[in-house]
């Protein structure tokens, strides 16, 4: 039954317990933005099974290192949270655990996302944050947690890591849309090949609610900024270090702290209100997106100092238990569907590390007051009746816990809305921040990212995976995708060209009027054979689309077109592809681009002019810029072009041609 659980490439699996088909990429939630529901048995079956598959020290984040030290509060921020350890000057015990995701218990010196988990413990509070060295996560819903980790763990047949097979890693990490931002633009850009954990920033990943004593609620994202500076290794150096010492990271941290070179981090936060999320285009429940510091500045709250190495690796590192549900008074979670994997953390502890939380490195500093007894390592023996309430004697909880100690939690931001099954993969505009990341990179960093992609994609045996990764990347960085396609072979390059051609046609739907949608649909379907692509799905999008607000994104995506004009298609792909492109006149492209600018941002009258100038480079490469734009103006397709546009385009024809040729050279460089 287990072997037949998943049905090939379908997004449906058979739930073992109920023998029924269940969507594998959706979760049952309380409304579109509400919490996950406990009655979604198929989801928890998937999550809890993963908790029990291997010993905890051989599953996720197995190649770990850790150290101990102190948290020292810099300022008094109890106004925004009631946690006991947040008063100015307060010092409590602190532990940081670093680990890589991929592999079983292999080298930590690999290009991978590195976990940065933190445990803050005092006699009055326990707070644990589980994050990594990028401010975002791989995915949105906890349902995909096991699937992503399986992609980087050992195969059952030979214990070789899945990640060692490039096509499997690419399929699971590069092609899945929510993970593109994390893996492609943080891991491959160099943030994952960190020089040392002491030179690594950390992030809490999720948004947390901070509840003040008066009941007011704030949201916060936590950052750990390395006082030693952030540093990464180039890939060649990382390979050499790994060859010399597979435990380089562990050794480096241990030796530095043994010599008294203690690393220090600043704990900073971005504090927001829910109204801030309504003004800015962010969502507190989506862990795959960054809240830019330009929008919400960082506030430094405390220092984190590590000054003691572990005495026993197994006892103090491999047995350490982090729980995203462990929160001090006044700290609460938002309705983030990924952080609700907290059930899995507790379940893992109970199944692997005893039922009484008795392991010293995991034991809370606070006095334990509850009505629980028995289980491995149980030593809290009390002469009280452990049934509450009861008519014979007060329980430990009733006797010793004052009412004032109760948590003050925030009310749900979203009112109950009924059971809804929400797709765990699709969320609006997951590529936007990847584009912004690419645009903000300097050229040297862009080259490193492209080189990393070339290596990863070229290593994939499957041509279809090469195609999928290259096409997905093209939505974000067109010129770079063309360079990757040229490096990995004609299959990826050809598919990249076809994807762009379909995108040109499908994007017309966003701009088309309702009475033109059927005509656009028919045009797309009739062109599908010419570009050798099944266009039915895109054609249906034309009929269904009514999202005029998306036109800005569409206009920006037209930046992919210079590399797919007929003039250079033969160089990148083949003459047949060049012919396919020529069936859609360049003036059509200019029309769409200009219309996008005019519809989306009418207040910025210069946008349509800029778009026209940009796309005149395409027709300039054909030596017909002035004629094409003249024909477009004569046709008056969209009523956005004027004589000034025509004159400017013609005057800049020669300059546009030179710029376009330069871009082509850049796109196919070595």
Swiss-Prot record:
The keyword Nucleotidyltransferase does not apply. Heme binds at residue 345. The active site is at residues 61, 132. Its cofactor is heme. GO terms for biological process: hydrogen peroxide catabolic process; response to oxidative stress. GO terms for cellular component: cytosol; peroxisomal matrix. GO terms for molecular function: catalase activity; heme binding; metal ion binding. The keyword Iron applies. It is found in: Peroxisome matrix. InterPro entries: Catalase, Catalase_AS, Catalase_clade2, Catalase_clade2_helical, Catalase_core, Catalase_sf. It catalyses: 2 H2O2 = O2 + 2 H2O. Its EC number is 1.11.1.6. Keywords: Heme, Hydrogen peroxide, Iron, Metal-binding, Oxidoreductase, Peroxidase, Peroxisome. Homotetramer. Catalyzes the degradation of hydrogen peroxide (H(2)O(2)) generated by peroxisomal oxidases to water and oxygen, thereby protecting cells from the toxic effects of hydrogen peroxide. Belongs to the catalase family. This is Catalase.
